[in-house]
Amino acid sequence: TLTETRDYAVVTDHPQEVREILEGFEADWHRQTFAPGNDARMIWCPINGRDRIARFIDESKHKLVVQNERYQDAVILERLVRAAERGVKVHVLARPPHTLKKDKLVEGVGGLRILDDVGIKIHKLKGLKLHGKMLLSDDTAAIVGSINLAPGSFDSRRELAIEVRDPDVVERLRKTAHHDWKHSHPLDLSDQGLMADLEDRQAGAVDRLALGTGSGKTSKPAGKNSKSPVKKRSKGAGKKRSKTAARRKKKS
């Protein structure tokens, strides 16, 4: 982990934050209910995580950097889309689809494609495995913790994050985020790109993404010297399909 993955840790000596962490640990250890209250400084799941992160995104005015393993929560995806549509420059760092768990593959790819469709830039790290969870807004505030942007993390697990505004800490995070983006590749979310990324997966992975030929057999991923039977996905394809379906329905 120390040499092969991108991870983060924040040290705090703020009395309320330290007290919250201790109280949360003791409650969990003794299997008791933990309620930090509306004035909680820490970001807790499954208590206030989704609301706090959604609000953080909503407050971003110019630039938002997001590093996370999973992009699957509908509320957070909507907030990221809204941010892009109001002119915020959004940079998303994600893990390649082939690293996702098999039962999370469709959700994970679907979430990334939603972001891609509104023009959000999505990259993958070179040389490091992305494990850290970090949001950086306007180079002035950040959220660092263990929360994946997925319903399971927000609703079913004990996850913890901290919001930081200390200039020195934020600057270190900014430099790291800048370095990671500079040393990253655009993530190809086209049908051909996904099939190429999944080529090392077991048989059936491509069919689960509905990228096969429709024969019920697994399609061979597109390699450098192979021709894919699937056309490259284009933006706006979903709208064309919807209009075609509507015309058919009207005729019938």
Feature names for model-found ranges:
Residues T1-M42, P46-D51, R55, E59-S252:
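PLD/PLD-like phosphodiesterase catalytic module centered on the HKD motif
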